[in-house]
Structure formats: structure tokens, C-alpha cells
């Protein structure tokens, strides 16, 4: 068997990955240093977050005291800016590149990032005290009246309205009152009175 036959057999395996001569196994010290770096990064983030909260609380107390004293409206309120300490982190990532050629190599990239200080500003008390009115609908009052849901009538009321409209339309109201002597209501009245 030649090297090409061995490679073609290996490439058919689902879990096959090329390994170059330059690859080195990671030692425990590299793994520990990565864990240590992650822990340090997490602690730095937590410290910066606590500092921001502390600064925000102090600024809010100052604003509250100014509002409480009543002199806040006459004086100009300046936004508070927070300066974050510059933190430089170095991250090393190793990427393996898989290809169909047997000479795949591992690349190592080192990047350095610097976070720029982002000033945080507290909105002025005058802007926060302003009460916003609810927005008025944009339709005209006539359209609002037309779009209101109509009151639904129950079946009995609808039947009475339909019968009344029919009687008025046909003009048979007088005839019904004269010739309705054999109706149910008349019989009930007769029985109740006698």
C-alpha cells in the first residue's frame, strides 16, 4: 500500500482529522494558564461593573438632593462622565485548518485589544420629570364614531324591532289591533279577569 492509499482510506472515516508534524499536544500548564486568564478577565469585568454602579448611585444621590432642595431647576445640571481604566487584554487562539491535502498546518494568532473609555452620562432631572401626554388618535372624530363597535341586540329585541318596522312599513298596525281577538295575549287576559 502506498501513502495515497492510506490517506484515501483515512479520509473516508467520519472522525478523521489531519495531523501535521508541527502540531503539539497541549500541556496542562497551557490549559491552566487559559483558565487563569479567563478568571482574571471575569474579575476585571466584575470590578468595572461595580465601579459603574457606585458612580451611578453617587450621581443619582446628587441629583436627588438637588431636586429635594428645589434649586435644581434654577441651576444648570451637567452630565456626569465616568472614565473607565484602560485594560489591555491579550488573547491567543489556535485554529486548526482541515483541508484535503495532507500538509494542513496549524496557525497561531495573537491579537491585542484596547477598550476605549466610554463616557456615561446621567440624563438631567428636568428631562426625567417631564410627563408625557398620551398620544391622541390620528383619526377624526367622525371616523372614531363610525368605527366604534355597535351595540349588539339580543334575539328578542331584534325580532321586536323587525316586527315593528314591518308593521310600520305595511301600515297594518290598526288592522292588527282590531282583528287580534283570537290571539294568545287576549286569551290570557280573559282567563285572568274571570
Curated annotation (Swiss-Prot):
- InterPro entries per the UniProt record, alphabetical: BCNT-C, Swc5/CFDP1/2
Q: Which PROSITE patterns match?
A: BCNT_C (PS51279)
Which superkingdom, per the lineage? Eukaryota
Output compositional bias ranges, type Basic residues. 130-139
Please note every region of biased composition (Acidic residues).
Answer: 1-15
Q: Where is the composition biased (Low complexity)?
A: 88-128
Basic and acidic residues bias located where?
32-68
The primary location reported for this protein is nucleus
Task: For the region Disordered, give the residue spans.
Answer: 1-156, 171-194
Annotated GO biological processes are:
chromatin organization
Keyword terms? Activator, Chromatin regulator, Nucleus, Transcription, Transcription regulation
Gene Ontology CC terms: nucleus
Record-annotated BCNT-C domain positions: 133-194
Localization recorded for this chain is:
Nucleus
Q: How does it assemble?
A: Component of the SWR1 chromatin remodeling complex.
Reported function:
Component of the SWR1 complex which mediates the ATP-dependent exchange of histone H2A for the H2A variant HZT1 leading to transcriptional regulation of selected genes by chromatin remodeling. Involved in chromosome stability.
Its family remark reads: Belongs to the SWC5 family.
Q: What is this protein called?
A: SWR1-complex protein 5
State the organism's lineage.
Eukaryota, Fungi, Dikarya, Ascomycota, Saccharomycotina
Which gene carries the instructions for this protein?
A: SWC5
